[in-house]
Design a protein with these regions (language model features):
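Active-site nucleophile and cofactor-binding loops and adjacent substrate-binding regions
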Residues: 19-21, 227-232
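Gly/Ser-rich oxyanion-binding loop with an adjacent helix/lid
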Residues: 1-93, 219
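C-terminal nucleotide
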Residues: 77-225, 242
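A short glycine-rich, hydrophobically flanked beta-strand micro-motif that places a catalytic Asp/Glu
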Residues: 5-9, 210, 226
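Methionine-biased hydrophobic packing positions in alpha-helices, especially
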Residues: 65, 192, 228-229
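Short, histidine-centered active-site or binding-site loop motifs used for metal coordination
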Residues: 11-13, 105-107, 232
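Small/polar glycine-rich anion-binding or flexible loop at a beta-alpha turn
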Residues: 210-214, 230-235
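Single conserved hydrophobic/aromatic residue that forms the stacking wall/gate
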Residues: 236-239, 243-246
Length: 246
């Protein structure tokens, strides 16, 4: 169904900064072809096609969250996604007087040669160990912390840390959505710091530059939260008066 076409791509998204520039490219390209050649593909089909491009052709065993956010995201909304069922809902992104600030650390990042696929393998190993005794769990994110604690002696240290992080982070995500909907933005900011600490300590995907910058924000009054985002960028929640210091 595809005919000939010429394509020129321009973007102000930094490449390799971990803010889903590749998902933006693949999804934008898919939507463009869908319109140009009147392919009649649904948004969900475009998400799956764009995901397959990264998963099967590029070789990044990524989830579908980035592609889903690019295509289904709305202005001033946050998206809560169940990656198992692809059920989702949009909630209001009302951060009151606070601003969201993204910071590019300019540290080089190449996901294809990074630890991403290794972490995927480690999480699968953790789940396999758990399923030997608790086969009712299909996904690591669903496993309660107490079960992971009880099986600690069965894990290598790094695998134990990966399992613990995934279980806790899933709970933090649900709690974060609840806090935002209740307008508890300061408490949400606290969760961001908790997440970054465990991304660094237990999931081991941070770096010294990111850790330094997150710790530095704790000394800036009215910056209420900071964490790494995606690859090597940071996301902060701050009062507008502190943006220059960040």
């Amino acid at each position: 169904k595809l005919g000939r076409f010429e394509c020129f791509i321009t973007s102000d998204l930094p490449i390799g900064a971990g803010i889903s520039s590749s998902a933006a490219l693949s999804c934008g390209f898919s939507k463009g072809l869908n319109e140009l050649f009147d392919l009649g593909l649904s948004d969900l089909e475009l998400i799956k096609i764009s995901h397959a491009a990264e998963h099967d052709f590029v070789g990044i065993k990524c989830g579908v969250m980035d592609q889903f956010a690019v295509i289904m995201g709305k202005i001033k909304k946050l998206l809560i996604l169940n990656c198992e069922t692809l059920n989702y809902k949009l909630i209001d992104a009302d951060f009151k007087a606070f601003k969201i600030v993204l910071l590019n650390t300019n540290v080089s990042h190449n996901l294809a040669s990074s630890e991403y696929n290794i972490r995927r393998q480690e999480c699968n190993m953790a789940l396999s160990i758990i399923q030997n005794q608790y086969n009712e769990y299909k996904f690591l994110a669903d496993v309660p912390e107490k079960i992971i604690f009880s099986l600690k002696k069965n894990f290598k240290k790094n695998i134990y840390h990966r399992a613990l992080f995934v279980s806790r982070e899933n709970k933090r995500t649900l709690k974060a959505a609840e806090l935002i909907q209740r307008g508890k933005i300061e408490e949400f900011g606290n969760l961001m710091y908790h997440t970054h600490r465990e991304l660094s300590k237990y999931y081991e995907v941070s770096c010294k530059e990111l850790d330094f910058l997150v710790d530095f924000t704790k000394n800036i009054s009215n910056v209420i939260g900071s964490r790494m985002m995606g690859g090597l960028s940071l996301i902060h929640i701050s009062e507008p008066t502190r943006l220059a210091e960040i």
